[in-house]
Amino acid sequence: MTHQTHAYHMVNPSPWPLTGALSALLMTSGLTMWFHFNSMILLMLGLTTNMLTMYQWWRDIIRESTFQGHHTPVVQKGLRYGMILFIISEVLFFTGFFWAFYHSSLAPTPELGGCWPPTGIHPLNPLEVPLLNTSVLLASGVSITWAHHSLMEGHRNHMLQALFITIALGVYFTLLQASEYYEAPFTISDGVYGSTFFVATGFHGLHVIIGSTFLIVCFFRQLKFHFTSSHHFGFEAAAWYWHFVDVVWLFLYVSIYWWGS
């Protein structure tokens, strides 16, 4: 490696941005094909390409940070700014869904029956599965904080236990959400209520799956001693993301499940 007199990481040429963009194109095109022609071939191809890209790209980043020492404090600072901006963009993303929901519910049109929920819609009871889901995610927020503090204090086993509990709670939340969707008395086709409900909660569920994936990767990295008490931004970013998912769910619960019912 050539000698450099600065702390920045000069990344080597990589094919993964190209394959990542290709997978995004395949997934969005595949989603359209699935909706309109009931064909999932392109969607499955896009998902497979996306998962392979993520695996290989993360593998490269882990190699560069953990084994080659490219993630200096200056580089980590840049990564922190990047993660903060990413979470801000996600906040704006969900703001659009809440805007659509409140735009429709605060002034229901005559087509909706002049009331909210619209005529003919039987909303879910917010004190049943949604309340359990809220408890599960709040508990996972406590356990991920426990894992983070254990890591900073050098308690490796406690960190692994807390992280495993968080992952288990995330998987449990996903299963509860899937059962709720299966038993829901309305569908995404049931007007503005169905579409705002399933798009907002569905995208949140997707973020829970993504966050759980981040945490699973961190769990296996910790098993291989990749994190230290002072060098663990990969885990820290996953924890930030998980707290974001928690907060979004609280807004979803209060707005769509409780107030909206």
From Swiss-Prot:
GO terms for biological process: mitochondrial electron transport, cytochrome c to oxygen; respiratory chain complex IV assembly. Component of the cytochrome c oxidase, the last enzyme in the mitochondrial electron transport chain which drives oxidative phosphorylation. The respiratory chain contains 3 multisubunit complexes succinate dehydrogenase (complex II, CII), ubiquinol-cytochrome c oxidoreductase (cytochrome b-c1 complex, complex III, CIII) and cytochrome c oxidase (complex IV, CIV), that cooperate to transfer electrons derived from NADH and succinate to molecular oxygen, creating an electrochemical gradient over the inner membrane that drives transmembrane transport and the ATP synthase. The keyword Transmembrane helix applies. This is Cytochrome c oxidase subunit 3. Component of the cytochrome c oxidase (complex IV, CIV), a multisubunit enzyme composed of 14 subunits. The complex is composed of a catalytic core of 3 subunits MT-CO1, MT-CO2 and MT-CO3, encoded in the mitochondrial DNA, and 11 supernumerary subunits COX4I, COX5A, COX5B, COX6A, COX6B, COX6C, COX7A, COX7B, COX7C, COX8 and NDUFA4, which are encoded in the nuclear genome. Keywords: Membrane, Mitochondrion, Mitochondrion inner membrane, Translocase, Transmembrane, Transmembrane helix. Pfam families: COX3. Residues 35-40, 106-128, 184-190, 257-261 are mitochondrial intermembrane. It catalyses: 4 Fe(II)-[cytochrome c] + O2 + 8 H(+)(in) = 4 Fe(III)-[cytochrome c] + 2 H2O + 4 H(+)(out). Belongs to the cytochrome c oxidase subunit 3 family. It comes from Tragelaphus scriptus. GO terms for cellular component: mitochondrial inner membrane; respiratory chain complex IV. InterPro entries: Cyt_c/ubiquinol_Oxase_su3, Cyt_c_oxase_su3_dom, Cyt_c_oxidase-like_su3, Cyt_c_oxidase_su3-like_sf, Cyt_c_oxidase_su3_a-hlx.
